[in-house]
Amino acid sequence: MKRGCAIAVMICGLITSVSAASAADLIVQEPVFEPLPQPALAGWYLRGDIGYNFKSKTGGKWDFWNQFEEPYRGVDDTFNYDDFSLKGGASYGVGVGYRFNDMLRTDLTLDYFRASINGRTNCPSYVKSSHGLNPVEDNCHYEDNSKASVWTAMANAYVDLPRVGPLTPYLGAGIGAAYVKYDTWKTSEICPTCTLQSDKDGFDSWRFAMALMAGVSYDLTDQLKLDLGYRYLRVNGGNAYGYDEQDRQVINQYGQGAGADGPQAKDNGFNIHTVRAGLRYEFR
């Protein structure tokens, strides 16, 4: 009897051990998922752009030098251009920048363009009279033309707006400096009896510049972007050209006196509207 009870206890213990082991086998461990690495957004980038500058109107003024003998020799009057325009043309640019996050980036850019300049002014009444023309009629004018090379060095900042698929719209602004260099200015006096043709040395100068930008970039790859945008560039005014050889002479047909020196004309600056396309490569 006692022996039978002992065997029964052993069997119950064995069954309990097997049941506990089976229950342990049924416990399923929860999988641990490591977070996926996020793409690095911060880093340097390079950019290159080509664009087209639309024709723009500006203004300017020039001094009329009286060649008569002393005490009448000198600047007789100052005239505003009736028309002063910068023709359209291509522009080219390169830059290096840094992206801080998915919204903010900055860059330094260097751009270049070259454009024709045209100016027109009516002749003063006393010049018309000297040609035997009616001084109150529109019968005499000056035509000026030259070319200008413009380099801009700008520091820019951009805010990238929320993405729409592969497209990222953006807004930007920049400040910097513009180097403006004029070629020789050619002036023609236009009227039935006019013969004046003169060349004047173009001036060069550094000027303040500012820009506003808007556009959209398209992801060609994770690192290469196609950039389509618009830029408004304001370049401050400065010296345009000096006096011609006759005005600079100390001795002329009217006698002897001081010759003209320094700038004869100044422009009012340029408001340049540009559409641009470029590539931006981001290092990550």
Curated annotation (Swiss-Prot):
<protein>
    <recommendedName>
        <fullName>Uncharacterized protein BMEII0376</fullName>
    </recommendedName>
</protein>
<keyword id="KW-0732">Signal</keyword>
<dbReference type="InterPro" id="IPR011250">
    <property type="entry name" value="OMP/PagP_b-brl"/>
</dbReference>
<feature type="signal peptide">
    <location>
        <begin position="1"/>
        <end position="23"/>
    </location>
</feature>
<dbReference type="InterPro" id="IPR027385">
    <property type="entry name" value="OMP_b-brl"/>
</dbReference>
<comment type="similarity">
    <text>Belongs to the surface antigen msp4 family.</text>
</comment>
<dbReference type="Pfam" id="PF13505">
    <property type="entry name" value="OMP_b-brl"/>
</dbReference>
